[in-house]
Amino acid sequence: MGKRFAGQMDKEKAEAVEQRAYRFEGFPSQGQAHLLSQFIGSARFLWNRMLADWKDSYKETGQSAPIRTPASYKGEPDLAWLKGMDSLALANVQRNFQRAVKEFFSGEKGCPRFKKKHACPDAYTTNLSNRDKPNLRLSGCLLKLPKIKEPVRLRVHRKIREGGLLKNCTVTREPDGRWYFSLLFEY
């Protein structure tokens, strides 16, 4: 068997992987809700900053410049506050932005747009970073998220199939103030 590259899977393994998502209402404390709101705002801010930088570069050169990483933004003195945010959430912003630019140039979609505070969904996604010492885990009705010390209480209203690995979590704040946590498991 030859070398395998990142993102490349055996056909048998690809068929064997099943993903299942569950969405539960959550009840974060006031402090947790404040942190989650900051993570949502930082994700929107980074998207808008990446888009502005990309558009400026595209106007100047007429070509798509390489997209900066969240770490490069964290190094700027006026953006040092990004260091306190969930790095995996910011990495997901970069991945989504790269996909949007790719779809724009392939003609599948229009040009990426800026995200306004009250006109886009209040959400961010974070991933599992380490299987041995998971930063993201569900224990009964308590969900441990990165950068949040205490677990968030969920209303687990349906049974979660055993044996799955929690891969990511999308945190959403609805306009009525309720919080939802979408958990993606891989079996």
Protein language model features and the residues they cover:
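Nucleic-acid substrate recognition interfaces
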Residues: M1-Y187
